[in-house]
Design a protein with these regions (language model features):
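Conserved ABC ATPase "signature" region
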Residues: 77, 96, 100-123
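Catalytic Walker B motif of ABC-type/P-loop ATPase nucleotide-binding domains
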Residues: 152-156
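ABC ATPase "signature
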Residues: 210-211
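Conserved ABC ATPase signature
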Residues: 88, 127-134
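Conserved ABC transporter NBD signature motif
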Residues: 56-67, 71-72
């Protein structure tokens, strides 16, 4: 369980995340959806201990985000927007390298499991820098699973991929659902709708709506999720304009 209370991140005069309040259930695949600059990646970076919040409190599996950050790092992992692979190592070398860093017991079994899950057999001997975008993303996520994290952060996992590669990666992410808690950021509406148990819509640093895709469609009174998202964002922008 992740409990977030008034989480805020400020960069000088810019409020990147503004008093975020949210609970994410154990085993849930939760998506943060928003346009560029909405605060999704900043939120992920705070929750994964990469940057400190300006204020607020976060409880992750009964651990305090700031006070217990070293313990939290043992139970989480992240696949960032920029693929986290060693470009001059082969796919297999990348997996063994990260297994060594995390001191994974029975690492051969874990590596075989990940190779099978992500269908990496045919590219094992290729250097990471020669891989297609789809395979680079697969390898990056495989690496983030090497330590069996209880919580996995996927920051824009299909960013820049063609539609075939994107759908292929969705199938893998679907297989992970329920086995670990997943927090995914995306600006692809179809991705959030297809994969998520629940979706949080962010705009200008704030969480402005929360629910399943069906609940959000119902709240917005639209025919589909894309129209619901657009309406929710536009109404929030108009509300902020009127306040100003």
């Amino acid at each position: 369980m992740i409990k977030i209370n008034n989480l805020t991140k400020k960069y000088k005069d810019k409020l990147a995340v503004d008093n975020l309040n949210l609970e994410i259930k154990t085993g849930e695949l939760f998506s943060l959806l928003g346009t560029n600059g909405a605060g999704k990646t900043t939120t992920i970076k705070m929750l994964s201990t990469l940057i400190l919040p300006t204020s607020g409190e976060v409880d992750i599996n009964n651990l305090d985000l700031v006070k217990d950050s070293s313990k939290i790092k043992e139970i989480i992992n992240i696949s960032p927007q920029e693929t986290a692979v060693a470009s001059n190592l082969t796919v297999l070398e990348n997996l063994y390298f990260m297994a060594g860093i995390y001191q994974i017991p029975n690492k051969e079994d874990k590596i075989k499991e990940l190779i099978k899950l992500f269908k990496l057999e045919e590219v094992l001997k290729q250097k990471a820098k020669t891989l297609s975008g789809g395979y680079q993303r697969k390898l990056s996520i495989a690496i983030s699973l090497i330590n069996n994290p209880k919580i996995l952060f996927l920051d824009e996992p299909t960013l820049g991929l063609d539609v075939i590669s994107r759908h292929d990666l969705w199938k893998v992410i679907e297989l992970l659902k329920g086995k670990t808690t997943i927090i995914l950021t995306t600006h692809y509406m179809e991705e959030a709708e297809v994969l998520s148990d629940r979706i949080g819509i962010m705009n200008k640093g704030k969480l402005i709506e929360l629910g399943t895709s069906k609940e959000l469609i119902k709240k917005a009174k639209t025919k589909n999720f894309e129209d619901a998202f657009i309406k929710i964002i536009e109404e929030d922008n108009n509300e902020n304009t009127n306040i100003c």
